UniProtKB/Swiss-Prot annotation:
Subcellular location: Cytoplasm
UniProt: ATP binding residues: G122, T123, K124, G125, K126, S127, T128
Function according to Swiss-Prot or TrEMBL: Cell wall formation. Catalyzes the addition of L-glutamate to the nucleotide precursor UDP-N-acetylmuramoyl-L-alanine.
High-level lineage: Bacteria, Pseudomonadati, Pseudomonadota, Gammaproteobacteria, Lysobacterales
GO cellular component: cytoplasm
Designated name of the protein: UDP-N-acetylmuramoyl-L-alanine--L-glutamate ligase
One of the Pfam families matching this protein, by short name: Mur_ligase_C
Sequence similarity: Belongs to the MurCDEF family. MurD2 subfamily.
Length: 468
């Protein structure tokens, strides 16, 4: 559905965060007098009222009955379509779409494809991978947009002039299904990995996997680039797409620190500013994507040396009294915490884990701790007691210290004390969201920096957003 097709319909916006505001502005550009209703909370309602838009109404209760009064509801990504009120309204005929679907419909060519649209998703690593892809494309002289879930809603860049040659688009699991629903098809879709995540939004692990894979199953990209090492992806059949693989010995893959293409060594990643083997494997994915676009990936690989790492992602803040502080606040799954720990093997590490409890399974994390644990683990947050109870029977035999904290400040105090005069690495990689304590993972990362004695402004915005 294109924006012009909304004219004359009963249309509502559900959510007034950045995506909701971007949708409002996009609609007003094309439909300046279209009556609209915004569903938002009371605080946001005051912001909406300040717009003084006579064709804009506000409702603060998004009940099934209220939603069902509209033909089209443009919802923000964080609002699950599986919510009871959304399901009930949909059953009564309301159509729910998101800004991602509107953007793709606006850009689709007559054959359905969106030229230059490269969609990146995965449970972890998608922001860094998308930014690295944009970095390499720009290094090759191509005007490229870095947009989507990474921090710039697609509808904020609806029609930039001149248009970019490529769109590097990060999509969360909340957005991946929108591509297929738009009827449009991206030029390339890259899926990095799949682990259980966002189960409170999706309702189950099976639904999460289904919704995530909708990017390639329903979105039908011209090229689907998949991780051959991921069991969810290795079994996919995508007859309407050209399927390519990375992390496969016949394609782009990593051996030690060296990127190979088949049997040919291409690039030594030892000096690339990307900590962790998982990031170097994702560099393989980026190079495979660049090659799939018809560009010289081998020649572009050295451009990765000038990539600027993203904040809150294994971000080294500095050292104080022999303790190095590393901010990995973006970590919201146990798998992400494990990947972070792997970057500091053989080092003295105090790991801070815990946060909002989304019901994720920490058994695999515990199994890893039984074999290869850091020196100290400090649990915190709503799911801290659950993680602590799981690890307590293992601590003595596996040889790690285990501590329970009331909050982040207390956790850092316990970690510093445990590391002692010998120092080491104090790693914030919570494996859980920040909800209930912080507005988002960025606020959590800034608080961590402040408590460590660093300027919270060091947790800066993601560089390179928008069209460059």
């Amino acid at each position: 559905m294109r924006i012009s097709q909304l004219e004359g319909k009963a249309v509502a916006l559900w959510g007034w965060a950045r995506e909701g505001r971007a949708a409002y502005r996009a609609l007003r550009q094309q439909l300046p007098a279209q009556p609209l209703t915004v569903f938002c909370n009371a605080e946001e309602a005051r912001d909406v009222a300040a717009l003084a838009d006579p064709a804009l109404q506000v409702q603060t209760e998004a009940s099934a009955q209220a939603l069902a009064a509209f033909e089209v509801v443009i919802k923000s990504p964080g609002i699950s379509p599986y919510r009871e009120e959304a399901r009930a309204a949909a059953a009564q005929g309301a159509r729910f779409i998101g800004g991602t679907a509107l953007w793709f419909a606006e850009h689709a060519q007559p054959d359905g494809y969106v030229p230059g649209a490269i969609c990146v998703t995965g449970t972890k690593g998608k922001s860094t991978t998308t930014a690295l892809l944009a970095h390499l494309l720009r290094a090759d002289g191509h005007r490229t947009a870095l947009v989507g879930n990474i921090g710039q809603p697609l509808l904020e860049v609806l029609s930039p002039q001149p248009p970019p040659a490529y769109w590097a688009i990060e999509l969360s699991s909340y957005q991946t299904g929108e591509v297929g629903r738009s009827g449009a098809r991206p030029e390339l879709a890259l899926v990095l990995n799949l682990f259980p995540e966002h189960l409170d939004w999706h309702g189950s692990e099976a639904a999460y996997v289904r919704d995530k894979l909708a990017l390639v199953t329903d979105g039908r990209p011209r090229i689907a680039l998949l991780n051959a090492a991921d069991p969810h992806l290795a079994q996919l059949q995508l007859p309407e797409s050209e399927v390519r693989w990375f992390n496969h010995p016949d394609g782009w893959h990593l051996r030690g620190d060296v990127v190979y293409r088949g049997q040919q060594p291409i690039f030594d990643t030892a000096n690339v500013p990307l900590p962790g083997e998982h990031n170097r494997r994702n560099l393989c994915a980026v190079l495979a994507a660049v090659e799939a676009l018809g560009l010289d990936a081998a020649a572009l690989a050295p451009a990765a040396l000038t990539f600027r790492p993203l904040p809150n992602r294994l971000q080294w803040l500095g050292s104080v009294d022999g303790i190095a502080y590393v901010n990995d606040s973006i970590s919201t799954t146990p798998h992400a915490s494990l990947a972070a720990l792997a970057c500091f093997a053989q080092q003295r590490v105090a790991l801070l884990v815990g946060g909002h409890d989304r019901g994720l399974d920490w058994q695999e994390f515990a199994a890893h701790m039984a074999q290869q644990a850091p020196l100290e683990i400090v649990t915190m947050g709503a799911n801290g007691p659950r993680i602590h109870a799981l690890l307590a029977p293992l601590a003595q035999s596996a040889g790690f210290g285990l501590h329970a904290a009331d909050d982040l400040a207390h956790a850092m105090q316990l970690a510093r004390s445990a590391l002692g005069a010998q120092g080491g690495v104090l790693l914030l990689s919570p494996g859980a969201p920040s909800f209930g304590v912080y507005s988002d993972y960025v606020a959590r990362g800034r608080h961590f920096a402040q408590l460590a004695g660093f300027d919270p402004a060091a947790i800066s915005a993601i560089p390179g957003l928008g069209v460059q």
